[in-house]
Amino acid sequence: MESLSPFIIKSSPERFDVIVVGSGITGGWAAKELTERGLKTLMVERGRPVEHGTGYVGENRDPWTMPNRGKVDARVAEEQYAVQRQCYAFDEHTKQFFNNDRDMPYSTPADRPFSWIRGNQLGGKSLMWARQSYRWSDLDFEANLKDGHGTDWPIRYADLAPWYSHVERFAGISGGKEGLAVLPDGEFLPAFEFNAVEQAMKQKFDAKYAPARMIMGRTANLRTATEEHAAQGRIQCQARAQCQRGCSFGAYFSTQSSTLPAALKTGRLRIATNSIVHSVIYDPKTNRATGVRVIDAETNETREYHARVVMLCASTLGSTAVLLNSKSDAFPTGLANSSGVLGHYLTDHLWSAGADGRVEGFEDDYYQGRRPTGPYIPRFRNVVDKHPNFTRGYALAGGASREGWQSAAWKPGFGKEFKAMIRKPGAWRFGLHGQGEMLPRFENAVSLHPTKKDKWGMPLLHVDVTHGDNDQKMREDMADTAAEILDYLGVKDIRKTISTAAEYPPGLAIHEMGTARMGRDPKTSVLNGFNQAHDVPNLFVTDGAAMASCAWQNPSLTFMAMTARACAHAVDELKAGRI
């Protein structure tokens, strides 16, 4: 990718066609789709610029070359990254991609913690996401209507199917075609392979639990690179397990590796970094958004950018915070909030429940590389038969690996024999852990704190969310079922785990959804089926805030497809003169 410098601006008198707020997975896609359709677009990012390749300062660095051997100084982590350090991807190699919690706080009730994992820089969390990429199905889009939890989705799978294909081909998704109704097939590159233990487990599982099936997880890593990916400057995955540090090979999908170069190539994109969007500018005479108010993150100076369309892609809670802060006489509780549901129905996937254990045999088997995905069991609960204790469902994911030399840390020994022992691979282990659907509930909400402000003078976001009874019963079933499956598969010394909310608060699945949901009725939803605000027709929200429920699959691929579809609709509406 060419240098970003020529495309970065501060102030601009120009009226753009579209302002895109945010530069992560959805912001990158919006910039690509809009510029390729001929629109002059401004991408506004609150964080610093990050160049592809040279900006990945932790990439290719072995732990012993780092000042703290790959770990973050304990005092720094506690004082500045108390929340971010809970993320699996946070370490000395990646710290620069995570928010400083001391500088960018938020609030929660004292007895209801929420862990908000954030990455405010150009590229957002697309630089360190887990890359699991799954289509949703009508089982998910029809669930609210059928069981009465949440509002009916205004779209169905058929509305998104061509857009799933569109984004899959460009992003590059590795996976296998399985013919499962609960998990539709897509436009896939070859799947990664099972290791010997996983293959044996798959055969036993598929035979016992059909129609449920163990498949290889679908991931936005290039198992092979097509001509389209080569044209983006990307090559196949090197299986280094360093994805969250940034990848100079462009082997996994990110804004920097994929959508941003495509947008810049058009010549129609400009980027405003270190620009914190305070609010959306609204004209009550025309009932239109006319731009955004911005605070410079470095100088505290204020400025405005103007456009014909405003598209919020600032993350679920980021976009909702902007809308809540965009108050006027017409919208005293937040822009486009005539329904009163803005900020409500927050969800995050249910996690941290499962089981693992020791596998006997396979001493002569090993594996090559560090595959970026693993075995995956798509949803099987409440697909045909109704579970007596809870509604909706979950997936199980995991894998098999061999213990390494670190396992010898607690073993006795010394000298030549001890060294020889730790050179040998340890025992095989196999585990499965759940990811389930949290029900949308009005009381799970975010709001602006009435008195507390950040260092830029903006109200802190206040997050109040808890798991409900259905959520907890599902998590219990995740752990019980994972242990039951492992026992049938012959795994020994099984350890069942299920964390409490204090140990593993909501938010740590890093799949926040809802708070500006789409729906059919403007009285009960913020957006229509094209991610367009019911109240303000030239305002769009295409990130996780738009979701009417959270399903059980990782949501990023659906965010991409929705964004591409919304952009096409926005362009059509502009050309028709309706917005």
Model regions and ranges:
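Glycine-rich loop(s) and the adjacent beta-strand/alpha-helix scaffold that form part
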Residues: 36, 40-70, 249, 266, ...
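FAD cofactor-binding and catalytic pocket of flavoenzymes
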Residues: 95-125, 129-130, 135, 148, ...
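Residue-level detector of alpha-helix initiation sites
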Residues: 20, 24-25, 196, 317, ...
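A conserved FAD-binding loop/helix module that cradles the flavin
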Residues: 549-567
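Conserved redox-cofactor binding core of oxidoreductases
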Residues: 67-100, 104-115, 120-121, 129-135, ...
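N-terminal Rossmann-like FAD-binding beta1-loop-alpha1 element of flavoenzymes
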Residues: 18-43
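A glycine-rich dinucleotide-binding beta-alpha-beta segment and adjacent secondary-structure elements
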Residues: 215-223, 240-243, 272, 278-282, ...
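A short, basic/flexible loop-to-alpha-helix module at the beginning of a structural domain
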Residues: 1-15
